Each structure stands twice: as C-alpha cells, then as structure tokens.
Regions:
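N-terminal export signals
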Residues: 7-27
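Conserved functional loop/turn residues at catalytic and ligand-binding sites
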Residues: 12, 29, 34, 70, ...
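Immediate post-signal peptide segment of exported/extracytoplasmic ligand-binding proteins
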Residues: 24-37, 87-91, 146-156, 215-216, ...
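N-terminal (or domain-start) structured segment
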Residues: 26-115, 155, 180-201, 294, ...
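An extracytoplasmic/periplasmic, membrane-proximal ligand-sensing/linker region
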Residues: 32-34, 177-180, 262-323
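Hinge/capping helix and adjacent helix->loop/strand transition within the periplasmic-binding protein
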Residues: 85-90, 105-190, 239, 251-284
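C-terminal lobe and pocket-closing loops
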Residues: 126, 209-278, 306-309
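Ligand-binding pocket segment of bilobal, Venus flytrap-like solute-binding proteins
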Residues: 155-236
C-alpha cells in the first residue's frame, strides 16, 4: 500500500473515532460551565427549597454553579417544555416532581411526552402525605372513616388546592381503592381554617404543613400515605395496613432532555446520590418533609413510568380534565 493511501486511511479512521472521543472528553470535563435546574413551581415551596439545597451542594462538589431557574405556569408544563427544547448536553435540567406524572394523563395535547422526552437522571426523595380529619369527625381510624363515609355517602367534603393536584388525586386513589363517596372542594387559598373548623372533613396533606396542628390535637391523623410509617409521625399507621395496594407520595428528582450524553447522566447521578447521602443534607431534607431516596437512572425511569401509569388510572376514574 502506498504511503499516501495509508495516511489517508489513518486520517479517515481517526475522524470516524472523533465523535466517540469527543463524547468521552465531554463527559470527563462535565460540567465546564453553569448548569440550570428548571423548576416549574414558584420560589419558596418545598420542591423549590429542596432543589436549591441540591444545587448548592452540587456547586460545591463540582466547582460549577448549579442555578435554580423558576418557571411556573401551565401546571408544570411550561418548565418541562423548556427543558425538552433545550440542548441535550446536561446544562439544562428539570426538577421532576410527582406533578409531572399526575399531569401527563391530564394534559394530552402537549408538544412533548414526559416519559419519552425527559431522561431520568437521579431521584432526590419522596414526600409522605398524611390523612387528617378534624376532631369533630367521629372516626379515629381508617376503617372507622370508611364505615362512616359509606354510611353517609356524599356528606364528607375533602379539600385540595385544585383539580389534579397531589392533594386531590391522592384522595381519588383512596376512593378508587375503598369505594367511598366524597365531595371535592378545591381551594384557591388556605384550606386549614375550614378544616380546623370542621367545615371541611378531610385533607390529604404534606406532613410539615399540618404537623403542629396534629401534635396540638387540633387535627387527627389517621394514616400516612406511604407504604411504611414515617419518622415525623411514628405512631401513625401506614395506609397500606388498611387499604391494600395504596401508596402515594410527592417526590422529586432530576431529569434531562432526551439525548443527554450517558456520561453526563452518570456523573449527575453519582454526585446527587452522594449529596442526598450526606448527613447534613439528609437532615435538612428530612426537615422539609422529604425522605431522601437515591436510585440509578434505570431505577428512576422505571419509577416514573409506574407513577404515570398509576395516576392515569386515577385520572380516568375521577374524570379529571384540564382546568
């Protein structure tokens, strides 16, 4: 073979290998500039605070800024679409939350598909809810509540911040599993005054928002919505102990646009796993009502798919439509 031809073949082989080498180099140097975490909720809510805690820790660990970018609107769909349309390079991430899985079967005419277009990167944790009633309601346990509700169909009102919210669909899952008839009352302001006064008889709430009233005896906790008891309410039983197959919780994690390099996903997953395992970070997450749970990208993807499937059944059962 002539020397010129050999040089040409070596050059061609080198060029063919260039994309793979660039991907490897990119993964090794990631992140090399600031990373944005898009949050589809206003500042100050629990998921936003959790995202800022993770962002701060990642900034310290990786030597690049992780910036929380709040983009509320259209449920969480505005933020999700922004990330879907971003360059799939690991520099625009999504704070994926339970609302994404709940909204997926409600908003069916969007320009994206949550499971198809968002890559699961890392789980941060789950937020247990608690079933609470006012002391005036003659039910001290979940079986007593179910019996009372069936004896008084349509006479128990439950509150939520709106149709399709976690507080709403968690109760609808309870209805689906138990067959009780309850009346949904959506609120645009605080639900607690009416609940404390007994004008609303039921609320499924994130634990931090009602913990003080439970401890003061102003509200009665009947069950937590996770499969096991939680540290904040050790004497409150898990719903599954009364209602087989019931499990519902808020959750949050990190997603990225489809096509994000595997190396960048792996780096983020490992670093976020280390962050949520850090005792100081873990304590702060628990203080927010978030139970830290790390997963591999594959495990988190399977979890998200299961959540979408579960809430699709509940949305259909309850006839929930876009507002």
């Amino acid at each position: 073979m002539k020397p010129a031809r050999r040089r040409l073949l070596r050059l061609a082989a080198g060029m063919a290998a260039l994309p793979a080498l660039m991907r490897i180099a990119g993964a090794q140097s990631y992140p090399s500039r600031p990373v944005h975490i898009v949050v589809g909720l206003p500042p100050g809510l629990t998921p936003d605070i959790g995202a800022r805690l993770i962002a701060q820790s990642l900034s310290q660990r990786l030597g690049q800024q992780f910036i929380v970018d709040n983009r509320p609107g259209g449920a969480s769909n505005l933020a999700t679409e922004l990330v879907v349309r971003a360059a799939p390079d690991g520099y625009t991430l999504l704070l994926a939350v339970a609302g994404n899985a709940i909204e997926a079967p409600i908003y069916t005419n969007l320009n994206f598909d949550f499971l198809r277009d968002i890559v699961a990167v890392a789980s941060i944790g789950r937020t247990p809810f608690v079933m609470v009633v006012p002391p005036s309601l003659p039910a001290h346990t979940v079986p007593e509540f179910i019996a009372y509700a069936k004896a008084n169909p349509g006479k128990i009102n439950f509150a939520s911040p709106g149709s399709g919210s976690a507080n709403h669909v968690f109760v609808e899952l309870f209805r689906l599993k138990t067959g009780v008839e309850l009346v949904h009352v959506p609120y645009r302001s605080s639900m607690l005054p009416d609940l404390l006064a007994g004008r609303i008889q039921l609320l499924f709430a994130a634990i931090p928002g009602v913990l003080a009233d439970i401890r003061a005896g102003k509200l009665r906790a009947l069950a937590v919505t996770t499969t096991t008891r939680v540290e904040a309410l050790p004497d409150v039983l898990a719903m599954r102990e009364f209602v087989p197959g019931y499990e519902a919780s808020g959750w949050l994690g990190i997603g990225a646009p489809k096509g994000t390099p595997d190396g960048n996903v792996k780096t983020l997953n490992q670093q976020i796993g280390a962050v949520v395992a850090d005792p100081a970070v873990k304590a702060r997450l628990v203080g927010l009502g978030i139970v830290p749970i790390a997963m591999t990208p594959t495990e988190f993807a399977k979890f998200m798919a299961g959540e979408v499937d579960k809430w699709a059944k509940v949305v259909k059962f309850a006839g929930i439509k876009p507002e």
